[in-house]
């Protein structure tokens, strides 16, 4: 049995959001073809993912020195530990995001900051950082109103570029993007674009 972490990063549901609609279709198809696998849903607009702030840095320092943490420090540090432990124990990752201002909602960066932990998801070596998640697989479902797969616009697409890079940094060897793109550029084809992406997602789910 495999464990899948399904991460969503949109404040609206699948009735409005293309990334959420395609993500939902993927997960439903995946569960149908992998009935014994466990899917854990993380909603980055609802679930608590602490910022790495002054409390966290203070708490980490106190842990190293054997000092007592404040209640706030303990809560944030413990929650961050739960998040990274959950992340590294999973076998597969699915993340559905919209493109916001060439990138993604800030909650996505906060989550990857939480799970990028030396000694857990990567390690430092004499040759530089080395990812530890070498037996994992990742899928990114990204909705973007324009066309960013090729041409000049591809150079300014920072969302999938970052997610692909951070998964590689953490050692994940298998990565795929399903892009739902162009629905704002050619609104008359918006429904067709979404349905094509849903079909692609449902098909890929069977082999994921």
From Swiss-Prot:
The gene is azoR. This is FMN-dependent NADH:quinone oxidoreductase. It catalyses: 2 a quinone + NADH + H(+) = 2 a 1,4-benzosemiquinone + NAD(+); N,N-dimethyl-1,4-phenylenediamine + anthranilate + 2 NAD(+) = 2-(4-dimethylaminophenyl)diazenylbenzoate + 2 NADH + 2 H(+). It is an enzyme of class 1 (oxidoreductase). Its cofactor is FMN. It comes from Staphylococcus carnosus (strain TM300). It comes from the Bacteria. Belongs to the azoreductase type 1 family. The keyword Oxidoreductase applies.
